[in-house]
Amino acid sequence: MSGSPHDFAADAFHAGQLYRSCFRELTENCGFTPNEMFVLLFLYRNAPEQDTAPAIAQAWNVSKPLVTRSVDGLQKRGLLYCVRDENDRRLIHLHLSDEGHAAAKALHHRCETFALTLQQGISEQEMQTLCSVMQKMQRNLNDLLERT
């Protein structure tokens, strides 16, 4: 990468394609759609503090109906169940079933292995720099989207 905006954009696009291809293979091999996988992983990592469809939608910056479709599919397969909040009947808390917890744990392990593979040959300092730069770029992209 020479550092020009065009080269950067091309490299970022190519890296994104490679990442999506690897990630698609990961999700296809486990039998979940990417959105279902994200719901399972989100609940595995964040419940019970954040265990509602609106919390998931906000964390991903996606619509609640998109999350609801994934929740419905996982619920039909017995991987999660819903419990209405005792204090606020409008809120529905999502809970992983034992089978859902086992599936989420296996997915979490696969994602951790995938992340470690991506990080091979990259020093801790380089990772910190990369994360810092990516956070700045995400803010820039969010600002750009808000202006349009």
Where are these regions (language model features)?
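N-terminal leader segment of winged-helix/HTH proteins
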Residues: 1-30, 77
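Alpha-helical linker/hinge and terminal dimerization helices associated
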Residues: 12-15, 19-22, 60, 103-119, ...
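Charged, amphipathic alpha-helical coiled-coil/dimerization segments
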Residues: 72-132
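N-terminal helix-turn-helix DNA-binding core of bacterial DNA-binding proteins
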Residues: 21-63
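Short, hydrophobic-biased segments on the C-terminal half of alpha helices
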Residues: 53, 71-72
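C-terminal regulatory/oligomerization modules of transcriptional regulators
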Residues: 1-4, 124-148
